[in-house]
């Protein structure tokens, strides 16, 4: 037996002087034998706010069985969840990115307060997987994550749909393109049950990242929430934690710079969500790994996009699962020498060993995942932009638009609500560049996602004719000429704060540029005249967050 297996919990529960501590455990039915084993947490992101995590409390019981089979004593605790799809387009969305930090802090609080020897993380939706992985990196004790899985595709008049279709239908209805009955039918049928939004949006992207980083069991990201494979993976994940404790393998042994390069490569090859840029930066920060936006752009330029999934493509996560999930993508990348195969993972084996042992289904797959030699695009799905409007950087999801260059007049709005109203009132014209500012990490605060606005633009048929730039974020379901994470943000006096209606903005994804066609003298003059707006919140969580949060170019982490 590894003598360090109970190193942490012995400090809380070992020795005669800890008799009162043990009494609390015995009040819940634990025995001396239970307490003598490694005591581990099962961190479950769960509430009844939405379907993304609703099934995870049940799966936690299966994880506990796996832990017990490996010789551990499991203790379940929950972490809070914000359902982005419900908070979207409201003040509630300001709490979404904040919840990532709250999840990480919650795990730290419970695990450290009770001296757990390790933990399993169960998480679905957008911010809980990155929050859990941040906690894993921060605490650096044996731990493993299992993503909760996607919902199944919905159905509208015989066609598969996802929540993306409902958002875009709002814009189509406002334009008179569809009937109220069609909108209602989509609303009623887009999400048929438990699990996360069906396309390669933020949640499913972060599910892929759990595997690509080496923090989850191979193949565990793609099974739908209702698939029986979820039960198998839940059990095996609990059992795998006990092996990690036995061999002393910790997250920072896994989360090397090369592991992050692997994750970024999978992100770029799959055309995943721009939110993954923020989250990978934040996980790297917690792991003590120096990762920058330049690393993302460098890897994007060498990585072909080989996956055909919504929002830019045709297929949902359910379809990817049927052809092999993350291991299929990673095998193709490894064979092309685009992944580091020698990186260690939570199995105790390397990426290469895992992929050699993983059995892919023998089914046609090139309609969803192409060979490296015949990609959908020659470079990655996300491009980092810099220039006079974004000295620190900005992101564009090139996999979700055919337009790589756009030049047009600015239509400036100081909030998402102002912009959304203008779009619904059809005040946005072809070639315009909608600017939504003061929605950054500090300015929002909380860096809201602009899905209501972007979907309305697309729904009105302007997705490839109107551009949008913001210091806020985008949902993974966003498509069109959409540039986000513009840094520095408006609230700290970034160049986006200096824009005026009619200024000519140039988006050049081919060359990685985001500029305003103004002389430096004019920008300096406007900067001298600019005054910071007063804080939107003077007390409470959002006020605290605004004071501590860093730039989106650093992952919007809290600086301490």
Curated annotation (Swiss-Prot):
Residue positions of the active site: 475
Stretches that traverse the bilayer: none
Job description of the protein: Functions in the biosynthesis of branched-chain amino acids. Catalyzes the dehydration of (2R,3R)-2,3-dihydroxy-3-methylpentanoate (2,3-dihydroxy-3-methylvalerate) into 2-oxo-3-methylpentanoate (2-oxo-3-methylvalerate) and of (2R)-2,3-dihydroxy-3-methylbutanoate (2,3-dihydroxyisovalerate) into 2-oxo-3-methylbutanoate (2-oxoisovalerate), the penultimate precursor to L-isoleucine and L-valine, respectively.
Binding-site list for Mg(2+): 84, 126-127, 449
EC number annotated for this UniProt entry: 4.2.1.9
Oligomer and partners: Homodimer.
Binding site for [2Fe-2S] cluster: 52, 125, 197
Pathway field: Amino-acid biosynthesis; L-isoleucine biosynthesis; L-isoleucine from 2-oxobutanoate: step 3/4; Amino-acid biosynthesis; L-valine biosynthesis; L-valine from pyruvate: step 3/4
Note on cofactor: Binds 1 [2Fe-2S] cluster per subunit. This cluster acts as a Lewis acid cofactor.
Residues the record lists as N6-carboxylysine modifications: 127
Protein name: Dihydroxy-acid dehydratase
Keyword Metal-binding listed: yes
Family of this protein: Belongs to the IlvD/Edd family.
Catalytic activity field: (2R)-2,3-dihydroxy-3-methylbutanoate = 3-methyl-2-oxobutanoate + H2O; (2R,3R)-2,3-dihydroxy-3-methylpentanoate = (S)-3-methyl-2-oxopentanoate + H2O
InterPro entries: DHAD_IlvD/Edd (IPR050165), Dihydro-acid_dehy_C (IPR042096), DihydroxyA_deHydtase (IPR004404), DiOHA_6PGluconate_deHydtase_CS (IPR020558), ILV_EDD_C (IPR056740), ILV_EDD_N (IPR000581), IlvD/EDD_N (IPR037237)
GO molecular function: 2 iron, 2 sulfur cluster binding; dihydroxy-acid dehydratase activity; magnesium ion binding
Cofactor: [2Fe-2S] cluster; Mg(2+)
GO terms classed as biological process: isoleucine biosynthetic process; L-valine biosynthetic process
Gene3D superfamilies reported for this sequence: IlvD/EDD C-terminal domain-like (3.50.30.80)
Keyword terms of this UniProt record: 2Fe-2S, Amino-acid biosynthesis, Branched-chain amino acid biosynthesis, Iron, Iron-sulfur, Lyase, Magnesium, Metal-binding
């Amino acid at each position: 037996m590894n003598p360090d297996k109970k190193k942490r919990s012995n400090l809380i529960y070992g020795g005669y002087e800890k008799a009162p501590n043990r009494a609390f455990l015995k009040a819940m039915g634990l025995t001396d034998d239970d307490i003598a084993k490694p005591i581990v947490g099962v961190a479950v992101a769960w509430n009844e706010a939405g379907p993304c995590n609703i099934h995870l409390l049940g799966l936690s019981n299966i994880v506990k069985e796996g832990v017990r089979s490996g010789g551990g004593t499991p203790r379940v605790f929950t972490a809070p969840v914000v359902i982005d799809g419900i908070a979207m387009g409201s003040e509630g969305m300001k709490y979404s990115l904040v919840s990532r930090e709250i999840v990480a802090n919650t795990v730290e609080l419970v695990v450290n307060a009770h001296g757990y020897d390790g933990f399993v993380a169960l998480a679905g939706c957008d911010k809980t997987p990155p929050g859990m992985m941040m906690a894993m990196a921060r605490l650096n004790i044996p731990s493993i994550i299992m993503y909760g899985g996607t919902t199944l595709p919905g159905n509208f008049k015989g066609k598969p749909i996802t929540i993306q279709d409902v958002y875009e239908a709002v814009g189509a209805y406002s334009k008179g393109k569809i009937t109220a009955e069609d909108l209602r039918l989509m609303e009623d049928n887009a999400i048929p049950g438990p699990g996360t939004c069906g396309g390669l949006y933020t949640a499913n992207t972060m599910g892929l990242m759990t595997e690509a980083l080496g923090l989850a069991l191979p193949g565990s990201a793609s099974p739908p929430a209702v698939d029986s494979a979820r039960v198998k993976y839940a059990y095996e994940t609990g059992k795998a934690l006990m092996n990690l404790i036995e061999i002393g393998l910790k997250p920072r042994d896994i989360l090397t710079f090369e592991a992050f390069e692997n994750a970024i490569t999978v992100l770029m090859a799959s055309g995943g969500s721009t939110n993954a840029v923020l989250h990978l930066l934040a996980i790297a920060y917690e792991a003590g790994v120096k990762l920058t936006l330049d690393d993302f752009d460098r890897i994007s330029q060498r990585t072909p996009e080989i996956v055909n999934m919504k929002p830019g493509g045709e297929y949902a996560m359910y379809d990817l699962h049927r052809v092999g999930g993350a291991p299929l993508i990673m095998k193709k990348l490894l064979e092309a020498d685009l992944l580091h195969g020698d990186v260690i993972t939570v199995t105790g084996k390397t990426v290469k060993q895992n992929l050699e042992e993983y059995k892919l289904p023998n089914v046609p797959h090139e309609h969803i995942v192409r060979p490296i030699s015949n990609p959908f695009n020659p470079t990655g799905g996300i491009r980092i932009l810099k220039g006079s409007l974004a000295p620190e950087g900005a992101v564009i999801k090139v996999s979700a638009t055919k337009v790589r260059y756009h030049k047009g007049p600015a239509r400036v709005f100081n909030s998402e609500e102002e912009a959304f109203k203008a779009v619904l009132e059809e005040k946005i014209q072809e070639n315009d560049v909608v600017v939504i500012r003061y929605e950054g990490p500090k300015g929002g605060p909380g860096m809201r996602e602009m899905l209501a606005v972007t979907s309305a633009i697309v729904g009105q048929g302007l997705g490839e004719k109107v551009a949008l730039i913001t210091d806020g974020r985008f949902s993974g379901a966003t498509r069109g000429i959409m540039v986000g994470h513009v840094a520095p943000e408006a609230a700290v006096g970034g160049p986006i704060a200096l824009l005026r209606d009619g200024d000519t903005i140039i988006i050049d994804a081919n060359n990685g540029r985001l500029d305003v066609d103004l002389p430096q003298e004019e920008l300096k003059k406007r900067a001298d005249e600019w005054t910071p707006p007063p804080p939107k919140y003077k007390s409470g969580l959002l006020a605290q967050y605004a004071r501590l949060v860093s730039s989106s170019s650093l992952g919007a982490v809290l600086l301490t």
